[in-house]
Amino acid sequence: MNIKIATIITCFNRKDKTTSCLAHLFEATNNYNIQHSQLPIELAIFLTDDGCTDGTADAVKNICKGKNIHIIQGDGNCYWAGGMRLAWEEALKSKTDWDFYLLLNDDTLVSNE
């Protein structure tokens, strides 16, 4: 049995912050899974790229190779709330029975503790 978590993120031209956020999230998840192998976390990322022009989507794809990532393209007018709604809707469309939804700002650094 796994704990299924859909992580919802919106970004706009914050490539470094977004990739750092994801790197910390993956590291914390991996550390948790090592310590709790009987109940690991299955993580999926639903990220709205709201019209980024700084290469955020490519950087995210690069850091997320082999991960369950869904990038939704916004038109630049979603802002945070609209982008989160788009990502949430995409998570719902996946037909996965998520245990939790994690709404995460792209400048959040998840701790290993």
Task: Please name every model-derived segment.
Residues 48-58:
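A conserved acidic beta->alpha catalytic loop
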Residues 50, 74, 104-106:
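Active-site acidic Asp-centered loop
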Residues 24-41:
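Short, acidic, metal-binding catalytic loop of nucleotide-sugar glycosyltransferases
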Residues 55, 82, 107-113:
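Acidic donor-binding/catalytic loop of UDP-sugar-dependent glycosyltransferases
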Residues 5-17, 21, 28, 48:
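A conserved hydrophobic helix/loop-capping motif in glycosyltransferases and polysaccharide synthases
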Residues 74-93:
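Glycine-rich, basic loop-to-helix element that forms the pyrophosphate-binding segment
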Residues 97-109:
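Short beta-strand-to-loop acidic/aromatic patch adjacent to the donor-nucleotide binding site
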